[in-house]
């Protein structure tokens, strides 16, 4: 198996890591950062921007720049909460009730999976550049409480990015792998994962390389962004009360508010009060309006009591499902940047009387764990075993709309479970299998994953035919359902694919489009790299000319200097005219001219290291040109040089001087 990387696909930031020499480490992106903003955008020229480049245009072009995409992956429009829709760009439903994100500059609508695929593609490209080889597979992490639909959609995003998703891994489990993969002692670990847009808690038992997940719980619509939104609303409400202007109705103002709120939240983790300054954020009747205020930690915490309550309940549920008490926990691992908030850490301490582990970086630990899982898959790590669980119950709809659970939540995976059902009407020739996921008693209150029909059942009284329904969950947490008529042996099976906002034809079309776009992207990248190389070489040439003037004087290597200047002008002309075909030839000429100048400088340094030699050369050249007949003595001449009052003859010249052979 080839190289597999680990990807933490986050709501706010994403990270890629790899296992090398048995140790996992994070790969820096092309911009030098260890985390990549999970932001995708399009410039006014319709150029795709991902990561930091996209984040830079959030304020200037909020309708064409998309963040928090993870909250939309694998979800139908009717499932979205109002807090998820509080974004500066437009989110709407198509005629099938699926989420779509319009982009005005490209005049297209995108499924969330398409945009997320661009993030995955960048992470993989950066990893390929670092490793010096193509990366075609990855372990991708998802929140533990992601349902089957969201997991399928994440896998589709990987397909659109052109990689094979070898394993879908729960984020808290990945964090535990990173924390305990080199520990041999038996530990009971609580992983508290509060990211930008999702929250998970998992309880694991770690012993001698075996990781047993005992219980998991969470909230896929709760994260650090919700805390940011409380600050946004606090500022906007105060501004509206004072000036009568609702900043949330202006896309650019809303984006500025969001960035200021995130910054204030981060700063309040280390200080008790922080200033918030947003000049010229709006215009009133009397001129520009500004935001100038201070936010202290106690006020911030007073804005979020209900959010803390929502963090409390999943932890209590996970402890109850595992059968553990809080005192049974040996270690607490905090994951996600939002866990740096003091009020969150204090909440965890009230639940589990332990100081959280500080040996892991909460922003990177999930990607490191994904890299460990990649090492397990490739066989690089042979002494580790991971036993995960399914986060939500799986079942089907029975008579009266009831939910019949076949696989309860927190069942270890992979797993196969089956049960026998019958017909509800006499002479019924077919049955519909409707698969649901969730914890509610009524099927319609849960998440519908898909349905299919088993036909060809022989006529019989009600309750006589026997239909065996089997659920299979693989190690990725993905579901396959089959139904078999025991009388005829007729069988119907289906891999649940209803989670994605794209059908198979759309995925195929997008893959073809992505390949065509990849060729264009490579061409654009090549053009940019050639221009950057040219600009770098011109800057280098300018430095070498200054060095030559200082060391040799303006006439010490006149021919080489003129050659560099002419070649440099040719390159600058090509850049100005955007003539990239001629640029390569001009670059070769500049490199050749620089080689000649560098050789001349090197020879001069080797032959004479005396100080002020450049100044002596300059004054000597000026004297020869202007005062050769008037000066009898040259105060700057070297004692061992040729006779005063005349220039060097062929015998006296430096044999390394190219002018010698003219």
From Swiss-Prot:
One of its GO terms (molecular function) is ATP-dependent protein folding chaperone. Residues 630-662 are annotated as: Disordered. Residues 649-662 have a biased composition (Basic and acidic residues). The gene is dnaK1. This is Chaperone protein dnaK1. Coiled coil: none annotated. The modification Phosphothreonine is found at residue 198. PROSITE patterns: HSP70_1, HSP70_2, HSP70_3. Keywords: ATP-binding, Chaperone, Nucleotide-binding, Phosphoprotein, Stress response.
